[in-house]
């Protein structure tokens, strides 16, 4: 057991060491700069890569529902690329404009493609994956559902986190008559896993999470969609405990933001309140003092890892910190205009609250 604990500590130190590295060329650090060896995803779609004429890198793929997506990256030397339409096309299916800089960056134990705007602010991430369906299921499990929730009557439902490598550990407690934890799978719409959990007995439940809380209702498939008006099992249950598969590596409610670059597909799984707290938790890790007697300050004062030290921690933020803050802000802004679509998809709630 001591050996396992020692290895865990070493791994954590290694991860933070990698995240603290400055912008040296990726090839010099790892030698793994061949984009064609990986499949890349924003959490909604995935792309394989092949080499075109003149060294152009062609990204081709799509969602689980439809294909035919394509764009290209033009190598600019080192870990720099330029975003452009694929040959014969005028559109780009990812967030970005022709000419945007794209860089291959190391964060934690992985490498990511990051798109930057004209002011060099990052706003889009492509992560390396192996299987899009499994990635979407893992994102739903760990970012949309994971946690313990209780309503005013005291009923509690717990969704347990599960690594992508062990989907058999994906369990929920509180939906069966005996109250035991049981495995679940996801229902699908348009060939894509969605926020419907299916238990071993075949019963299905639609799970909707907003800033008002978690609501679970029975559901059945009607034509091509899951019924959204079934019997309510629990309504507006409040999260009483955060659960994460990364809890053992980093303290906090959102350790994912300290260990990896987050994609839009992952960030859209969180409620607006979660996004706000996640963003502020990044600052809190670096010792930021928040508004005295404010909600944010009181929240972090309850955490034993929080040590407020400065009113400005901008010089303490790592490249990964800055990236995830920028990505969270981008999704918060997008939520202001995408609310009707996101409500239809059952993914999000209200617009972000003002700054702390």
Name each model feature, range by range.
Residues 44, 149, 153, 163, ...:
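Sec/Tat-exported extracytoplasmic proteins
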Residues 46-51, 60-109, 155-160, 164-228:
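Contiguous, well-ordered beta-strand patches that form the walls/edges
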Residues 1-11:
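Bacterial N-terminal signal peptides that target proteins for export
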Residues 267-307:
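Amphipathic alpha-helical packing elements
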Residues 116-146, 219-222, 226-253, 343:
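Pro/Ala/Gly-rich low-complexity, hydrophilic intrinsically disordered segments
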Residues 26-54, 60, 126-156:
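Tryptophan-anchored aromatic micro-motifs
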Residues 10-20:
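Bacterial N-terminal signal peptides
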Residues 22-37, 135-143, 243-258, 340, ...:
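Sec-dependent signal peptide cleavage junction
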């Amino acid at each position: 057991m001591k050996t396992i604990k020692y290895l865990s500590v070493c791994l954590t130190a290694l991860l933070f060491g990698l995240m603290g590295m400055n912008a040296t060329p990726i090839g010099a650090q790892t030698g793994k700069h061949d984009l064609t060896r990986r499949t890349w995803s924003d959490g909604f779609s995935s792309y394989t890569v092949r080499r075109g004429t003149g060294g152009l890198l062609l990204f081709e793929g799509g969602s689980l529902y439809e294909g035919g997506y394509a764009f290209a990256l033009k190598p600019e030397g080192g870990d720099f690329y330029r975003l452009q339409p694929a040959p014969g096309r005028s559109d780009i299916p990812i967030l970005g404009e022709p000419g945007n800089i794209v860089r291959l960056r190391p964060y934690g134990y992985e490498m990511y493609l990051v798109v930057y705007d004209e002011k060099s602010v990052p706003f889009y991430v492509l992560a390396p994956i192996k299987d899009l369906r499994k990635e979407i299921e893992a994102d739903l499990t760990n970012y949309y559902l994971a946690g313990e929730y209780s309503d005013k009557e005291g009923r509690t439902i717990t969704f347990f986190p599960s690594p992508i490598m062990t989907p058999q550990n994906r369990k929920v407690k509180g939906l069966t008559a005996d109250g035991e934890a049981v495995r679940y799978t996801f229902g699908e719409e348009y060939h894509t896993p969605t926020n419907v959990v299916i238990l071993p007995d075949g019963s299905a439940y639609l799970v909707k999470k907003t800033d008002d809380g978690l609501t679970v209702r029975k559901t059945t498939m009607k034509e091509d969609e899951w019924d959204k008006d079934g019997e309510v099992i629990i309504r507006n249950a409040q999260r009483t405990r955060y659960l994460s598969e990364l809890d053992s590596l980093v303290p906090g409610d959102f350790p994912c933001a300290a260990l990896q670059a987050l994609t839009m597909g992952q960030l859209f799984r969180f409620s607006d309140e979660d996004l706000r707290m996640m963003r502020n938790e990044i600052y809190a890790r670096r010792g930021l003092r928040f508004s005295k007697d404010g909600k944010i300050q009181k929240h972090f004062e309850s955490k034993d890892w929080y040590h407020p030290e400065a009113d400005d921690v901008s010089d303490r933020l790592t490249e990964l910190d800055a990236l995830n803050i920028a990505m969270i802000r981008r999704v918060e802004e997008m939520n202001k205009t995408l609310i009707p679509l996101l409500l239809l998809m059952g993914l999000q709630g209200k617009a972000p609250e003002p700054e702390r």
